[in-house]
């Protein structure tokens, strides 16, 4: 396959998958908009499916082979021989023709392919920068020696049924509790605010991070991140990543509030104390990345009505069928 065919095939597939993702994202947005009682776990799965559709549609291409009907017999054309009369033809002068369309398509397709590869490279370089930053934070973090914190952590992990609890460390480089690395996970606490955190706040913060661990969010987050890298130019990819991350945080907030020991207003005060902080990927912080996300999380705490559980599985399966 030459470079022109490769560029045309990849660009056409990017366009087709992008249009499909636009329709699917519109459907998911309408469902989340007009079903406010839909639980956060289902919302997270729906946006994860939007991102997965983009990745799978791009990397896995299997055209459906349709059976062809046999061609109808075509009557042979009747050739009538006619006497040719002598004629004199003037040979036209050769003129310079226009630039072939293949050359123009070659230039456009290859340039677009190069631009797409450059964009993916920029996204990958930014991700590697975050990974290197997180690696430095984990390397410089020290083991937690506070007996109060260790006792609360062990009791909470035992009550939640976490058999292999992540190593608990303290870091001077973070502002919020953070669960880092999908492999050999580490739970880091900010050294600046650890001494001033009460037992209830510390227990809720640890519960939130352990909820991420139980949900395996660090592993599932790779699919939306991959869609954002491959479709960096598509607004739906960024929307799916943002809404999936928000629904994921709300699901962990709901897991904390399901514990009868914690009240919504107490947890809301903790979210305000944690404030706004960004975590390098792959890591999950208890703080909100933006003030808008913090406001949305606080508003979700006000929903005291029970979420819609019935039909959530059927809804997810329906979205899978449409994807």
Where are these regions (language model features)?
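Central hydrophobic cores of alpha-helical transmembrane segments
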Residues: 45-50, 269, 314-318
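Short helix/loop segments within enzyme catalytic domains
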Residues: 58-65, 144-170, 207, 214-216, ...
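Alpha-helical transmembrane segments of multipass membrane proteins
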Residues: 29-33, 226, 297
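Cytosolic-facing loops and C-terminal tails of multi-pass membrane proteins
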Residues: 2, 93-132, 155, 159-161, ...
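Hydrophobic membrane-embedded segments
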Residues: 1-125, 139, 143, 147-165, ...
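Peri-catalytic and regulatory segments of divalent metal-dependent proteins
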Residues: 118-220, 262
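Hydrophobic, aromatic-rich membrane-embedded alpha-helical segments
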Residues: 54, 181, 187, 223-239
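Alpha-helical transmembrane segments of polytopic integral membrane proteins
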Residues: 24, 28, 52, 121-134, ...
């Amino acid at each position: 396959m030459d470079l022109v065919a490769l560029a045309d095939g990849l660009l056409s597939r990017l366009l087709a998958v992008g249009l499909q993702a636009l329709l699917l994202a519109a459907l998911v947005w309408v469902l989340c908009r007009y079903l406010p009682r839909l639980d956060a776990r289902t919302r997270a799965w729906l946006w994860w499916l939007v991102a997965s559709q983009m990745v799978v549609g791009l990397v896995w291409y299997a055209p459906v082979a349709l059976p062809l009907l046999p061609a109808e017999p075509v009557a042979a054309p009747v050739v009538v021989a006619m006497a040719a009369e002598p004629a004199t033809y003037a040979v036209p002068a050769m003129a310079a023709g226009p630039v072939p369309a293949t050359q123009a398509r070659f230039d456009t397709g290859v340039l677009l392919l190069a631009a797409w590869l450059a964009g993916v490279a920029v996204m990958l370089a930014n991700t590697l920068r975050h990974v290197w930053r997180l690696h430095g934070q984990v390397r410089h973090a020290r083991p937690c020696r506070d007996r109060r914190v260790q006792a609360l952590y062990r009791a909470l992990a035992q009550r939640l049924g976490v058999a292999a609890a992540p190593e608990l460390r303290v870091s001077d480089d973070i502002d919020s509790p953070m669960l880092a690395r999908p492999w050999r996970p580490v739970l880091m606490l900010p050294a600046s605010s650890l001494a001033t955190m009460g037992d209830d706040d510390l227990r809720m913060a640890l519960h939130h991070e352990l909820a991420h661990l139980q949900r395996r969010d660090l592993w599932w987050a790779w699919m939306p991140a991959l869609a954002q890298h491959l479709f960096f130019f598509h607004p739906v990819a960024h929307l799916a990543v943002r809404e999936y991350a928000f629904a994921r945080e709300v699901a962990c907030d709901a897991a904390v509030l399901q514990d009868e020991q914690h009240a919504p207003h107490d947890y809301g005060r903790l979210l305000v104390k944690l404030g706004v902080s960004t975590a390098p990927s792959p890591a999950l912080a208890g703080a909100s990345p933006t003030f808008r996300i913090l406001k949305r999380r606080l508003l979700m705490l006000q929903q005291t009505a029970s979420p819609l559980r019935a039909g959530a599985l059927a809804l997810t399966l329906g979205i899978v069928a449409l994807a």
